[in-house]
Amino acid sequence: MASSEELTATGYIQHHLQNLTYGKLPAGYVRHNADGTHTELAANTWTFAHTAQEAKDMGFMAVHVDTLGWGIFLALLLGFIFRSAVKKAHTGKPSGLLSFVEFLVEGINSVVKDIFHHKNRLIAPMGLTIFSWVFMMNLMDLIPVDWLPMLAQVVTGDSHTFFKVVPTTDPNATLGMAFTVFALMIMFSIKEKGALGFVKELTCHPFFAPKKLWYLNILLIPVNTILETVALIAKPISLGLRLFGNMYAGEMIFILIALLFSVGLVMGFVGGVLQWAWAVFHILVITLQAFIFMVLTTVYMAMAHDNHDEH
């Protein structure tokens, strides 16, 4: 991975946890090269980060190229798989792929119907898309941690190239998806209840006074607004961090197991057994995390359609 002089356990772990980052470094920035020399930039420069510090110094506008690349690639692959299944369905010839896709669609549709009791034809396809895409991104965690990063280093010719292959171990990806769900939740809530109904939901719940003491509701508005706003914002944050935390922990365990291969033949054998065992268990984790993300998204969509005034 990193050069031989930097290949310590700490360096190995840090290298695997760093994304391939593209961003802008300011004029006058001093870059530390792999050969020990330094280069001062004469102008603002858009470039790939060579170190974790450079990635940090690029700031908020930096892009994690590996996360975006794998996310888009897996989305396109998923679209190709579903398109192939649809074509086979039109020919009337049964196949393993078609049977699997039908099983997946029926299963997700059943789960969504149990949670979402309103009329919106977009929710079931949304649930299917979210589950499938998150599962595909999680599935990348089963690829041995060194294979694709080493391939990236061979292609670039740079032994210091960073390359993470599991998009869901990047909080930018998981929180990005979560806040997209949050935006849809707000949109559907306003669409179903109106802007006034949405504001009323934020200001008149969970505490409200009886009709005889209606004037007390004015005093409760600040309390309700604070509580509901915190609860609302907590939904996407917890949704994104839950997925990130579980996948990050799983990836870290794979990296720690991979370190055993550098200790010796016996520990390498132990590492192989542990890696196989953890991979088998991790299949459950990646599936469960995709399912939880989909279920919570559906729950939030149902909450957006619920009207408290009807109860």
From Swiss-Prot:
Q: Where in the cell is it found?
A: Cell inner membrane
Q: Which GO terms describe its molecular function?
A: proton-transporting ATP synthase activity, rotational mechanism
Assembly behavior: F-type ATPases have 2 components, CF(1) - the catalytic core - and CF(0) - the membrane proton channel. CF(1) has five subunits: alpha(3), beta(3), gamma(1), delta(1), epsilon(1). CF(0) has three main subunits: a(1), b(2) and c(9-12). The alpha and beta chains form an alternating ring which encloses part of the gamma chain. CF(1) is attached to CF(0) by a central stalk formed by the gamma and epsilon chains, while a peripheral stalk is formed by the delta and b chains.
Task: Provide the topology term for how it sits in the membrane.
Answer: Multi-pass membrane protein
Family statement: Belongs to the ATPase A chain family.
Q: Which residues cross the membrane?
A: 62-82, 123-143, 170-190, 213-233, 253-273, 276-296
Which organism's genome codes for this protein? Saccharophagus degradans (strain 2-40 / ATCC 43961 / DSM 17024)
Q: Which InterPro entries does the record associate with it?
A: ATP_syn_F0_a_bact/chloroplast, ATP_synth_F0_asu, ATP_synth_F0_asu_AS, F0_ATP_A_sf
What is the purpose of this protein?
Key component of the proton channel; it plays a direct role in the translocation of protons across the membrane.
PROSITE patterns recorded for this chain? ATPASE_A
Name of the protein described by the UniProt record = ATP synthase subunit a
Predominant location? membrane
Which lineage ranks, top first, belong to the organism behind this chain? Answer: Bacteria, Pseudomonadati, Pseudomonadota, Gammaproteobacteria, Cellvibrionales
A GO biological process this protein is involved in? proton motive force-driven plasma membrane ATP synthesis
> What GO CC annotations are associated with the protein?
plasma membrane; proton-transporting ATP synthase complex
Alphabetized UniProt keyword annotations: ATP synthesis, Cell inner membrane, Cell membrane, CF(0), Hydrogen ion transport, Ion transport, Membrane, Transmembrane, Transmembrane helix, Transport
- Any one Pfam family here would be ATP-synt_A
The record's section on CDD domains has:
ATP-synt_Fo_a_6
